[in-house]
Amino acid sequence: MYEILNRINGPEDVKKLSLGELETLSAEIREALFNRLTKIGGHFGPNFGIVEAEIAMHYVFSSPKDKFVFDVSHQSYTHKILTGRKAGYIDDARFSEDSGYTNPAESEHDLFNVGHTSTSISLATGLCKARELQNGKWNVIALIGDGSLSGGEALEGLNVAGSEIRSNLIIIVNDNQQSISETHGGLYKNLEELRNSDGKSEHNIFKDFGLDYIYEKNGNDIGSLIEVFKKVKDIDRPTVVHINTLKGKGYERAVADKETWHWTVPFNRETGEKLVAGGRNYVSVTREYILNKAEKDDKFVVVTPNMPMCVGLSPADRVKLGEQFVDVGIAEEQAVAMASGMAKGGVKPLVITNATFMQRAYDQISHDVCINGNHVTILLNNSAFDGLTDVTHLGIFALPIFTNIPDLTVLSPTTEKEFTGMLDWALDVHTGASVILIPGGKILNRPRADGFDGAMKYEIEQSGEKVAIIALGDFDQKGESLAEAVEAELGFKPTLINPRVATLVDKQTLDDLKKNHKVVVTLEDGVLSGGFGEKIAAYLGDSDLKVKNYGLNKVFYDRYKPAELLKELGITNESIINDVKKYL
């Protein structure tokens, strides 16, 4: 199956192959990609569409002397296979050795840990400047595409590349006419015009930035790519190589439905059936809420930086929403600032994306929304501890990032009714800015108060004595389990509290605990430093209550296993009870 691939142990082996062997290699690499992705999932369409280009890059250039910078790096699988990491694709037992993104800890051929869009050109300009200062002689190649050009940092990078870099810089624009969902904005209309004119259109954004430009329409033809890369190798000025590729090439389903197959869970290759159980979850709950809300309220509008599928909004849903749906492309800053303008204009914007991406818009949330007191609601997915675990995609920093912005209410629901109630309150009752963290895991039905009425007060789920457990968001379930364990082992019923509002220090409830409690335990599925529990500890600092905070350390964890990390951090019933015993 891997006759040619078995001979490839590094880039130098690629250079020894004939054109026919390179074409065979591309087919074998797609088989290796199938082997991995059908079993553990990952970024499908981007990698199937870029196989030939990355083979040609390693055939023409000489990594690691020549520097490859991958934008997002979600499309770097072929590069990894060619740089000594094929076992992570052809040997099932070694899948875990290889991350889904470039990682310098894995290989000298990976320069950066990257997982967010639009950074490659900026990073590459820095490498170029460092090379100029040291009189170096090597190629710097940035590979960008898949919608990344719509990000402001990419345009900033192009601006600097065209004006400040006076040496070799090769920017490969992988134009597959697609982002995570469809592309948006005038920039992509220009790319379309360039494609339709074989790169000859007089309207050329890259030339306007002062960059040289070459177009290659056969972006999945190895021979054509080798020739165009040879033309620009060792060039003495910044140059854009615009290649036209087919996202998902090699799998008809991925070509026909590029959005669904951008990223996939494990699947059956023959049928395309996904092998992870579906069913109702918080993504589908969010989708239902948005569609119902839009139908009833013509002032409601959804704004997203190219992440509609993070809340399940299909292309058909987006068409149905019509003018009440705005996709700004991968541009979080634009999404938040635009939403602030919308709020000022009298409508009700709901901004949706993954938690890890919203950190880019910290300034807009603080400066454009909160200082101005504008009514913007931000809905973040994958902020949970057991959500995305790649080091570049962690949502565990959401609490310390957003709970320390003045005049921003951060809500951490624990049930479906609480979640939808918080959406109702944030959109229709509250007049300021809110962040709502979409719960992770399964939808659980619990016998507790329905919805959320906006009362800035903790919910007492269980009244007890001696020990109070304050469990935030997704760690509410751990709080319930801990309360049962305390009662079983220590013989008394502890108090269990669902704080609901991560930015709230409920002084009345905390003061009441002083009457018959000795220990307060806080649980949060985020980083402790600057987070929720520290605020509780600070308020109770001059009391006789002992406060123990449990959460995550300020660490860039990478592909952790949740259960193992909880044990390592002492966030288990046994460990917490042993701590509590010391203060009773």
Functional labels for PLM-detected ranges:
Residues 1-81, 218, 222:
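N-terminal amphipathic, basic-rich helices that act as targeting or association modules
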Residues 40-42, 66-69, 113, 136-151, ...:
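A short, small-residue-rich loop immediately preceding and capping a beta-strand
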Residues 110-267, 273-279, 283-288, 408-517:
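Glycine-rich ThDP/TPP pyrophosphate-binding loop and its adjacent helix/strand module
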